[in-house]
Amino acid sequence: MSLFDGKKVIIIGDRDGIPGPAMEECLKGTGAEVVYSSTECFVUTAAGAMDLENQKRVMDLTEKHNAENVVVILGAAEAEAAGLAAETVTNGDPTFAGPLAGVQLGLRVYHAVEPQFKDAVNAEVYEDQIGMMEMVLEVDAIIEEMSNIRNEFGKFKD
């Protein structure tokens, strides 16, 4: 059984990293339903924090589908930006500016370059859509940051 079987997936891509449509393409055939997908400019938002509209969307979709059924996939270009977004959907908005301030959703959250995502999707499609970005992103730093956030704040340890 895949990590994505029957899950409602929220995709937050990055203009300078991995865009939403690339991750959507990878998820086809995984049993996941993409319920929201956007491509943001992570460095454009205040201090790299998650866009307030996206925070509201994540909160609303989590209320609708229940936290155990929701998975967030990020495409941030930098480990720090990925970490801030991951912290926002697990422990609440660390900048205390948005709708998720103080809201601990504890959602499953992964970056598109992490093995949990990469191993769950079609390898050929992944290579076409994301493979090139692996060469320019600091994959090890992103994996470490995401893992740390999940271990510290994630409610679901599967």
Swiss-Prot record:
Q: Which GO terms describe its molecular function?
A: betaine reductase activity; glycine reductase activity; sarcosine reductase activity
Q: Which residues form the active site?
A: 44
Q: Which UniProt keywords apply?
A: Oxidoreductase, Selenocysteine
Under Enzyme Commission nomenclature, its number is: 1.21.4.2, 1.21.4.3, 1.21.4.4
User: Which InterPro entries does the entry link to?
Assistant: GRDA
Pfam families given for it? GRDA (PF04723)
According to the UniProt record, one GO cellular component term is: glycine reductase complex
Instruction: Quote the catalytic activity from the record.
Output: acetyl phosphate + [thioredoxin]-disulfide + NH4(+) + H2O = [thioredoxin]-dithiol + glycine + phosphate + H(+); acetyl phosphate + methylamine + [thioredoxin]-disulfide + H2O = sarcosine + [thioredoxin]-dithiol + phosphate + H(+); acetyl phosphate + trimethylamine + [thioredoxin]-disulfide + H2O = glycine betaine + [thioredoxin]-dithiol + phosphate + H(+)
Q: What is annotated about its quaternary structure and interactions? A: Monomer. Component of the glycine, sarcosine and betaine reductase complexes, together with components B and C.
| NCBIfam families according to UniProt | reduct_selen_A
Record's family?
Belongs to the GrdA family.
Task: Say what the protein does.
Answer: In the first step of glycine, betaine and sarcosine reductases, the substrate is bound to component PB via a Schiff base intermediate. Then the PB-activated substrate is nucleophilically attacked by the selenol anion of component PA to transform it to a carboxymethylated selenoether and the respective amine. By action of component PC, acetyl phosphate is formed, leaving component PA in its oxidized state. Finally component PA becomes reduced by the thioredoxin system to start a new catalytic cycle of reductive deamination.
What name appears for this protein in its UniProt entry?
Glycine/sarcosine/betaine reductase complex component A
Species this protein is from: Alkaliphilus metalliredigens (strain QYMF)
